[in-house]
């Protein structure tokens, strides 16, 4: 339980549902340890409509451990690709929400390829990236740094970038073209902002949803930290 929120310790600092398909109801578990000297009731506040949570057991005695089981209802996700939110761990009865007890949530809904024709299946687009991980080092709070990735369609039909999103405000993205003919390429510019790095939890990364059936989801990780 490496992450601490008040007297409560958790095994994760973010809640992630990586590859969800429409109609699925995946679950994940957040392990909870009560290091306070009183009885604790684990509650997640401000749950979005597509998430539900149950604490097992409902109450934790002093020094006891338990878990919160979280279920994602994919039918209630608003769109394809990335949906993010924040939930808040209640540390005690009547707790308020704030930065200290915030837990970021992300869910990625994948496109459905079950209806594509045999012709499309045999001649798919294929995405190729010049890099899938960027090393940007340390940034001062007033500094920003940009890197460019080349995206190429090495497949047999038009490649569509259907969705392009960042997981948090530490990054910005610019994409020249959303549709690439076979053999064509384009530039994706990723910028890291030092001033926002201190505020965010989790790894800064970029998500792309494409119509390449073999690579419907691509995550670009950006290794960057703020100078203390």
Task: Go through the PLM ranges and name each one.
Residues 159-162, 199, 218:
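Extended hydrophobic-aromatic, low-complexity segments
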Residues 73, 90-94, 193, 209-213:
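Beta-strand-rich extracellular modules
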Residues 18, 55-60, 74-75, 137, ...:
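Beta-strand-rich interaction surfaces with strong enrichment in secreted/lumenal proteins
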Residues 189-198, 214:
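C-terminal functional regions that serve as terminal interaction/effector modules
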Residues 11-13, 22-29, 64-66, 75-88, ...:
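Short, solvent-exposed loop/turn segments enriched in Ser/Thr/Gly
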Residues 37-65, 156-185:
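Surface-exposed binding patches on compact interaction domains or structured appendages
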Residues 1-36, 92-150, 154-155, 212-228:
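Long, low-complexity ectodomains and other extracytoplasmic segments of secretory-pathway proteins
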Residues 65-74, 184, 188-192:
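Low-complexity, intrinsically disordered segments enriched in Ser/Thr together with acidic residues
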